[in-house]
Amino acid sequence: MKQTIGLLFIFLLWGNFCRAEIRIMPLGDSITEGGYEKRPGFPTTEGSYRTSLVPRLLSLNSKLSFVGSREAGPTALAQKRHEGHSGWRVDELIAGRVYARSYERGIRSWLPTYNPDIILLMIGTNDILQNYFIDQAPLRFQKLIDEIQRLTPRATILIASAIPTNNDHLNAEIEKYNSEIHSFVLSQRSQGASIYWVDMYNEAKMSWRKGDFSDGVHPSALGYLKMADVWFNHVAPFVSASLLRASLRE
């Protein structure tokens, strides 16, 4: 009898495993959104790093689903959903953004709606570009992570450092910001939080002088390929583990 119950449990678990869909949410600003290559004759950046990352991850696991309220990417990109919002700062991801005649909600709307298993987060560049109380940006980032964890306590959060620009002064501020949020991630990890550091700034080795940027802030197609490589190296190990966790959740 016990053996029969055990086999039945394994059968049900395997059935859920086979049906499980893993939801991945790219979350951030215009660098996540893509499409800011305006130079004539240069390859499009519509779809950002997702254009290269999505098919590579799908080749590992066909049950992945990229989610978000927005959709952008080239025709060949099978899954175009994301939460990349041009010009948005850290605090706006939490509270939303007020426009002249409208209001767009933030993660308090998106996360409950799409319930992602994995979140690919890169945010903070606009806080520095807009010189918006830069010293308080790491604290705002901590509040953002607290809110993400409250809204999606089972999600795995991969946090990418902000990438460089073509301005040395801005890069110094970006490096300081990255260092502080890295320390925060390490602190969270020591407490058992499911958040992980992706050192995009150093691992992608992007440079204006190498043709990795289209306008000094937004990556070129070449820059996005480098970003996709880094994301893939960090996300791939979580795909199968997240698949099993999702099957147990159903």
Role assignments for model-derived ranges:
Residues 4-14:
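Sec-dependent N-terminal signal peptides
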Residues 122-129, 145-177, 201-204:
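Active-site segments of SGNH/GDSL-like serine hydrolases
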Residues 81-86, 163-245:
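Catalytic His-Asp segment of secreted/periplasmic serine-dependent ester chemistry enzymes
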